[in-house]
Amino acid sequence: VAEKQPVMSINSDGGIIIDSTVIIDGHEDLLPRVITHIHSDHIRRLRASVQKSSLLIGTPLTLEWLKVLGFKIPDSKIVPLNYDQSIELGELKILLREANHIPGTAQVVVETTDQRIVYTSDFKKPGERTPILSADTLVIDAVYGDPTFRRPFDDYIDEVLTDLIRELLAKGPVYVYGYYGKVQEVMDILRRNGLDAPFVLSHKQYVLAKVAERFGMKFGDYLHANSREAEDVMRDGWYVYFTHLAASRRTPNGLGNHVLLSGWEFNKPFKRLGSRRWLVAFSDHADFMGLVRYVEDAKPEQVIVNARRSTAGEKFGDYVAKKLGIKVKLLP
């Protein structure tokens, strides 16, 4: 009997539709939707899904964080899946596996009777903190798909970031700007690296941290920016203040040093942007070599590069086809 290939497509949201049965990180009316994590490019049209999808599937942390971000998801539609837990939808088995990106991020494994499809979602540290999953078809977002997008310092960036913040704290408060989820990851890293200054958080970052603690993350001493305790701490001038990257566009106040977190820097681990402004090349995504390593070790029969969430997806696809000899499709 010939193998029945699952029908797969990618829509204009970057949503991955498999066998007209499920969509991952995108919206189609009535279809169950898997949400790999809370970043905006993966939750496009989520309000439509809250209204019209039959089910919303994700890790418990991701689903709780979405509520903090203002999505009112009816309990009847919520399907929390822990890592290594699965659910059957029609003839498909859906399994979530860990990805090292922001807390709660999942890779998605979809199994049919004779095919195994893996969507990596966003990841970094493949083979170390992100398990590399074998697949017949591997769907990947080539976020850093150009061969020049390499950060040789990725392996020690956590220490660089901690050392810089520690050094700047000696001169006064430090303001750190990052996306939702990335801030909580950095708080965790700083604590694990022994930084003990109090953390002060803007409202939404604070609520996200509170939820993450229920799921086992530990952030030590942190305070809501509007609390009386935070006022006292800020008067002392020894603290790290975390807020969303968007806030860095406003003129910083006269206090302290300001550190922006961004993966779009490939020459050095950190650089000075101004007298008290710094950029640290702290990324939540694997660089070009990390993407290649994942594909190489997963040994898929074919790779589908998700063009909607890739930068230089064509270059990445060409590299995989020529250097690794694997069949590649760029969709949509």
Regions found by a protein language model. Give the residues of each.
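His/Asp/Glu-rich metal-coordinating catalytic cores
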Residues: 2-28, 32, 39-177, 193
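C-terminal regulatory/interaction regions
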Residues: 2-3, 11, 225-332
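A short, well-structured beta->alpha microelement
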Residues: 6-26, 79, 124, 214-250
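Active-site regions of enzymes building and remodeling cell-envelope glycoconjugates
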Residues: 31-38, 49-58, 71-83, 91-94, ...
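Active-site metal-binding loops of divalent metal-dependent hydrolases
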Residues: 38, 61, 99-102, 121-123, ...
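Short, well-ordered alpha-helical microsegments
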Residues: 43, 63, 105, 126-128, ...
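Active-site-proximal loop/helix segment associated with metal-binding centers of metalloenzymes
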Residues: 97-110, 123, 128, 137-147, ...
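Binuclear metal-ion centers of metallo-dependent hydrolases, dominated by the metallo-beta-lactamase
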Residues: 131-134, 146-233, 302-332
